[in-house]
A protein has these predicted regions:
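Iron-sulfur cluster-binding electron-transfer modules in prokaryotic oxidoreductases
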Residues: 1-276
Length: 276
Protein backbone atom coordinates (compact mmCIF):
# COMPACT_ATOMS: atom_id res chain seq x y z
CA UNK A 1 0.00 0.00 0.00
CA UNK A 2 2.81 2.43 0.88
CA UNK A 3 4.53 1.64 -2.42
CA UNK A 4 1.33 2.26 -4.41
CA UNK A 5 0.84 5.59 -2.67
CA UNK A 6 4.26 6.71 -3.89
CA UNK A 7 3.55 5.96 -7.54
CA UNK A 8 3.07 9.12 -9.63
CA UNK A 9 -0.28 9.47 -11.39
CA UNK A 10 1.46 9.96 -14.71
CA UNK A 11 4.96 9.31 -15.98
CA UNK A 12 6.91 11.31 -18.56
CA UNK A 13 8.19 9.69 -21.72
CA UNK A 14 11.07 7.44 -20.68
CA UNK A 15 14.41 9.18 -21.01
CA UNK A 16 16.12 8.49 -24.34
CA UNK A 17 19.48 9.18 -22.69
CA UNK A 18 20.98 5.78 -21.95
CA UNK A 19 18.78 3.73 -24.29
CA UNK A 20 21.98 3.14 -26.20
CA UNK A 21 25.57 4.25 -25.86
CA UNK A 22 25.70 7.91 -26.83
CA UNK A 23 28.17 10.77 -26.87
CA UNK A 24 26.98 14.37 -26.61
CA UNK A 25 29.64 16.65 -28.03
CA UNK A 26 30.11 20.27 -27.12
CA UNK A 27 29.80 22.94 -29.79
CA UNK A 28 32.54 24.89 -28.08
CA UNK A 29 36.15 23.86 -27.87
CA UNK A 30 36.84 21.93 -24.73
CA UNK A 31 39.37 19.51 -23.41
CA UNK A 32 37.23 17.60 -20.93
CA UNK A 33 35.36 14.35 -21.35
CA UNK A 34 33.10 12.72 -18.78
CA UNK A 35 30.95 9.64 -18.42
CA UNK A 36 27.43 10.35 -17.13
CA UNK A 37 25.53 7.79 -15.08
CA UNK A 38 22.05 8.23 -16.56
CA UNK A 39 20.38 6.25 -13.77
CA UNK A 40 17.29 4.06 -13.74
CA UNK A 41 14.58 5.54 -11.50
CA UNK A 42 15.53 9.07 -12.48
CA UNK A 43 15.28 8.29 -16.19
CA UNK A 44 11.71 7.11 -15.64
CA UNK A 45 10.62 9.80 -13.20
CA UNK A 46 12.23 12.97 -14.57
CA UNK A 47 14.21 12.87 -17.85
CA UNK A 48 14.68 16.65 -17.65
CA UNK A 49 17.48 16.18 -15.13
CA UNK A 50 19.77 14.36 -17.55
CA UNK A 51 18.85 16.81 -20.31
CA UNK A 52 19.83 19.78 -18.13
CA UNK A 53 23.04 18.08 -17.05
CA UNK A 54 24.13 17.43 -20.63
CA UNK A 55 23.17 20.94 -21.81
CA UNK A 56 25.14 22.68 -19.08
CA UNK A 57 28.21 20.47 -19.44
CA UNK A 58 28.20 20.85 -23.23
CA UNK A 59 27.99 24.65 -22.90
CA UNK A 60 30.99 24.47 -20.60
CA UNK A 61 32.96 22.61 -23.26
CA UNK A 62 32.58 19.12 -21.80
CA UNK A 63 31.90 16.05 -23.94
CA UNK A 64 29.44 13.67 -22.26
CA UNK A 65 29.26 9.91 -22.88
CA UNK A 66 26.48 7.65 -21.57
CA UNK A 67 26.90 3.88 -21.71
CA UNK A 68 23.86 1.72 -22.44
CA UNK A 69 25.02 -1.17 -20.24
CA UNK A 70 25.48 1.08 -17.21
CA UNK A 71 21.73 1.25 -16.67
CA UNK A 72 21.72 1.00 -12.86
CA UNK A 73 24.37 1.61 -10.22
CA UNK A 74 22.91 -1.08 -7.93
CA UNK A 75 21.86 1.26 -5.13
CA UNK A 76 18.17 0.35 -5.14
CA UNK A 77 18.89 -3.37 -4.80
CA UNK A 78 21.51 -2.61 -2.17
CA UNK A 79 18.98 -0.57 -0.17
CA UNK A 80 16.61 -3.53 0.14
CA UNK A 81 19.37 -5.95 1.06
CA UNK A 82 19.49 -7.83 -2.23
CA UNK A 83 23.26 -8.19 -2.34
CA UNK A 84 23.24 -10.50 -5.36
CA UNK A 85 21.24 -8.17 -7.58
CA UNK A 86 23.26 -5.18 -6.40
CA UNK A 87 26.53 -6.90 -7.20
CA UNK A 88 25.33 -7.87 -10.68
CA UNK A 89 24.35 -4.27 -11.41
CA UNK A 90 27.71 -3.06 -10.12
CA UNK A 91 29.55 -5.61 -12.26
CA UNK A 92 27.68 -4.67 -15.45
CA UNK A 93 28.28 -0.99 -14.84
CA UNK A 94 31.96 -1.39 -14.05
CA UNK A 95 32.71 -3.55 -17.08
CA UNK A 96 30.86 -1.12 -19.34
CA UNK A 97 32.75 1.86 -17.98
CA UNK A 98 36.03 -0.03 -18.22
CA UNK A 99 35.62 -0.12 -22.00
CA UNK A 100 35.16 3.65 -22.03
CA UNK A 101 37.97 4.36 -19.60
CA UNK A 102 40.38 2.25 -21.64
CA UNK A 103 39.88 4.68 -24.53
CA UNK A 104 41.57 7.28 -22.34
CA UNK A 105 41.03 10.93 -21.46
CA UNK A 106 38.05 10.54 -19.12
CA UNK A 107 38.17 13.31 -16.53
CA UNK A 108 35.27 12.24 -14.33
CA UNK A 109 32.34 9.89 -13.91
CA UNK A 110 29.39 12.15 -13.18
CA UNK A 111 26.35 11.29 -11.07
CA UNK A 112 23.41 13.69 -10.86
CA UNK A 113 21.46 11.60 -8.35
CA UNK A 114 23.32 11.78 -5.07
CA UNK A 115 22.10 8.36 -3.95
CA UNK A 116 23.78 6.91 -7.03
CA UNK A 117 26.88 9.02 -6.58
CA UNK A 118 27.38 7.82 -3.02
CA UNK A 119 27.07 4.22 -4.23
CA UNK A 120 29.56 4.66 -7.08
CA UNK A 121 32.08 6.39 -4.84
CA UNK A 122 31.89 3.31 -2.60
CA UNK A 123 32.41 0.72 -5.37
CA UNK A 124 36.06 0.19 -4.41
CA UNK A 125 34.99 -0.83 -0.91
CA UNK A 126 31.97 -2.81 -2.07
CA UNK A 127 33.74 -5.14 -4.51
CA UNK A 128 37.32 -4.72 -3.35
CA UNK A 129 37.49 -8.44 -2.56
CA UNK A 130 36.66 -9.44 -6.15
CA UNK A 131 39.84 -10.04 -8.22
CA UNK A 132 37.95 -9.36 -11.46
CA UNK A 133 36.48 -6.05 -10.34
CA UNK A 134 38.75 -4.61 -7.65
CA UNK A 135 41.03 -2.74 -10.05
CA UNK A 136 38.34 -1.11 -12.16
CA UNK A 137 36.24 -0.39 -9.04
CA UNK A 138 39.12 1.56 -7.49
CA UNK A 139 39.59 3.44 -10.74
CA UNK A 140 35.89 4.31 -10.99
CA UNK A 141 35.56 5.36 -7.35
CA UNK A 142 38.52 7.70 -7.77
CA UNK A 143 36.88 9.36 -10.79
CA UNK A 144 33.32 9.55 -9.40
CA UNK A 145 31.98 13.07 -8.87
CA UNK A 146 28.66 14.68 -8.13
CA UNK A 147 27.64 17.00 -10.94
CA UNK A 148 28.12 19.99 -8.64
CA UNK A 149 31.78 19.04 -8.11
CA UNK A 150 32.41 18.93 -11.85
CA UNK A 151 30.69 22.24 -12.60
CA UNK A 152 32.52 23.98 -9.75
CA UNK A 153 35.81 23.43 -11.60
CA UNK A 154 34.51 25.03 -14.82
CA UNK A 155 33.92 28.69 -15.87
CA UNK A 156 30.20 28.71 -15.07
CA UNK A 157 29.91 32.51 -15.01
CA UNK A 158 30.79 32.60 -18.70
CA UNK A 159 27.58 30.85 -19.80
CA UNK A 160 25.07 32.59 -17.50
CA UNK A 161 22.41 34.67 -19.27
CA UNK A 162 21.56 38.18 -18.00
CA UNK A 163 18.72 38.56 -15.50
CA UNK A 164 18.26 42.30 -14.85
CA UNK A 165 15.35 41.71 -12.47
CA UNK A 166 17.01 38.84 -10.65
CA UNK A 167 16.20 35.15 -10.68
CA UNK A 168 14.28 34.87 -7.46
CA UNK A 169 14.92 32.90 -4.31
CA UNK A 170 15.36 29.17 -3.78
CA UNK A 171 15.32 27.06 -0.64
CA UNK A 172 18.05 24.44 -0.87
CA UNK A 173 17.32 20.99 0.55
CA UNK A 174 20.53 19.11 1.27
CA UNK A 175 20.01 15.42 0.47
CA UNK A 176 21.38 13.02 3.10
CA UNK A 177 23.34 11.07 0.51
CA UNK A 178 25.00 14.30 -0.62
CA UNK A 179 25.68 16.10 2.65
CA UNK A 180 26.36 13.04 4.82
CA UNK A 181 27.31 10.36 2.29
CA UNK A 182 29.55 12.54 0.11
CA UNK A 183 30.24 15.44 2.51
CA UNK A 184 28.98 17.96 -0.05
CA UNK A 185 26.80 20.60 1.58
CA UNK A 186 27.68 24.20 0.68
CA UNK A 187 28.87 23.68 -2.90
CA UNK A 188 25.44 23.40 -4.63
CA UNK A 189 24.29 26.55 -2.83
CA UNK A 190 27.42 28.38 -3.96
CA UNK A 191 26.70 27.41 -7.57
CA UNK A 192 23.09 28.59 -7.34
CA UNK A 193 24.26 31.93 -5.95
CA UNK A 194 26.91 32.17 -8.67
CA UNK A 195 24.24 32.04 -11.38
CA UNK A 196 22.09 34.66 -9.66
CA UNK A 197 19.64 33.04 -7.25
CA UNK A 198 19.08 34.09 -3.66
CA UNK A 199 19.53 30.88 -1.68
CA UNK A 200 17.89 30.11 1.64
CA UNK A 201 18.29 27.15 3.96
CA UNK A 202 15.55 25.62 6.04
CA UNK A 203 16.12 25.07 9.73
CA UNK A 204 17.35 21.58 10.63
CA UNK A 205 19.09 21.15 7.26
CA UNK A 206 20.79 17.99 8.51
CA UNK A 207 17.51 16.10 8.84
CA UNK A 208 16.29 13.52 6.32
CA UNK A 209 13.15 14.23 4.27
CA UNK A 210 11.97 10.63 4.72
CA UNK A 211 13.04 9.25 1.36
CA UNK A 212 16.43 7.71 2.10
CA UNK A 213 16.68 4.32 0.44
CA UNK A 214 13.29 2.63 0.62
CA UNK A 215 12.13 3.35 4.15
CA UNK A 216 9.42 5.68 2.82
CA UNK A 217 7.89 2.39 1.62
CA UNK A 218 8.98 0.04 4.42
CA UNK A 219 8.49 2.57 7.26
CA UNK A 220 5.79 4.90 5.86
CA UNK A 221 4.70 6.45 9.16
CA UNK A 222 8.23 7.46 10.14
CA UNK A 223 8.94 8.68 6.61
CA UNK A 224 5.76 10.74 6.48
CA UNK A 225 6.58 12.37 9.80
CA UNK A 226 9.97 13.39 8.48
CA UNK A 227 8.43 14.61 5.23
CA UNK A 228 5.93 16.86 7.02
CA UNK A 229 8.63 18.25 9.30
CA UNK A 230 10.84 19.02 6.30
CA UNK A 231 7.98 20.62 4.34
CA UNK A 232 7.10 22.85 7.31
CA UNK A 233 10.72 23.98 7.54
CA UNK A 234 10.83 24.64 3.79
CA UNK A 235 7.62 26.65 3.98
CA UNK A 236 9.03 28.79 6.80
CA UNK A 237 12.11 29.58 4.69
CA UNK A 238 9.77 31.52 2.41
CA UNK A 239 11.19 30.87 -1.07
CA UNK A 240 8.82 29.95 -3.94
CA UNK A 241 11.15 27.24 -5.32
CA UNK A 242 13.17 24.37 -3.84
CA UNK A 243 16.38 22.79 -5.14
CA UNK A 244 17.71 19.33 -4.27
CA UNK A 245 20.35 17.00 -5.65
CA UNK A 246 18.61 13.63 -5.45
CA UNK A 247 15.60 12.25 -7.30
CA UNK A 248 14.25 10.51 -4.19
CA UNK A 249 14.10 13.78 -2.26
CA UNK A 250 12.59 15.59 -5.25
CA UNK A 251 9.78 13.04 -5.54
CA UNK A 252 9.24 13.01 -1.78
CA UNK A 253 8.95 16.78 -1.37
CA UNK A 254 7.52 18.10 -4.64
CA UNK A 255 4.10 19.65 -4.16
CA UNK A 256 2.69 23.11 -3.50
CA UNK A 257 6.23 24.50 -3.60
CA UNK A 258 7.92 23.04 -6.69
CA UNK A 259 11.07 20.99 -6.10
CA UNK A 260 13.56 20.61 -8.93
CA UNK A 261 17.12 19.41 -9.29
CA UNK A 262 19.86 21.97 -8.69
CA UNK A 263 21.16 21.40 -12.22
CA UNK A 264 17.76 22.36 -13.67
CA UNK A 265 17.93 25.77 -12.00
CA UNK A 266 21.51 26.22 -13.22
CA UNK A 267 20.42 25.22 -16.73
CA UNK A 268 17.57 27.75 -16.58
CA UNK A 269 20.03 30.49 -15.61
CA UNK A 270 22.23 29.51 -18.56
CA UNK A 271 19.53 29.79 -21.22
CA UNK A 272 17.85 26.42 -20.77
CA UNK A 273 14.11 25.83 -20.33
CA UNK A 274 12.33 27.16 -17.23
CA UNK A 275 12.74 24.83 -14.27
CA UNK A 276 9.28 25.68 -12.92
Amino acid sequence: RAALAKLPRTLPTFDRVGRKTMTFRSRTKGTRRVILLAGCAQRALDPRINASTIRVLNKLGVEVTVREEAFCCGALAHHIGDAGAAREAVRATLLSWQEELDKGDVDAIVANASGCGTMVKDYAHMVGDDPELAGIAARVSALARDVSEVIADLPLAGIVTPAPEGRGSITYHSACSLQHGQKIHDLPMQLLREVGYEVKQPVEPHLCCGSAGVYNILQPEMAEGLRQRKLENISRAGAPMVAAGNIGCIQQLDGDIPVRHTIQYIDWACGGPPAV
